């Protein structure tokens, strides 16, 4: 299991306070403080790759851990990204927004060359672009 030292928060993946607040709310609803938000990339979707969100108690040795303090200033949550997904998510921002279309997690990913209208699928350019 990975070391949970806060100094690991040197990732270039950005995890917004609003996303952290929503994750903390969902974890509280699940009544399991050991849960972390895992963001992953898998093949599929209409553009070639798709984002996945899940809760995970397990922190793997190759996970990048992003720790974000919640707006209450007291609690924090962990975002986990496996090493394969990390290459597609570097410099990305994971946010939680409320708008006309409802509430949702969104990923603003500068590595995506095209995105699907639904926002959950994307494609990249050449592998050299990563």
UniProtKB/Swiss-Prot annotation:
It comes from the Bacteria. Keywords: Iron, Iron-sulfur, Metal-binding. It holds the Pfam family Fe-S_biosyn. Binds 1 iron-sulfur cluster per subunit. The keyword Nucleotide-binding does not apply. InterPro entries: FeS_biogenesis, FeS_cluster_insertion, FeS_cluster_insertion_CS, FeS_cluster_insertion_RrpA, HesB-like_dom_sf. Iron-sulfur cluster binds at residues 46, 116, 118. Belongs to the HesB/IscA family. PANTHER family: IRON-SULFUR CLUSTER ASSEMBLY 2 HOMOLOG, MITOCHONDRIAL. Required for insertion of 4Fe-4S clusters for at least IspG. Homodimer. This is Iron-sulfur cluster insertion protein ErpA. It comes from Legionella pneumophila subsp. pneumophila (strain Philadelphia 1 / ATCC 33152 / DSM 7513).
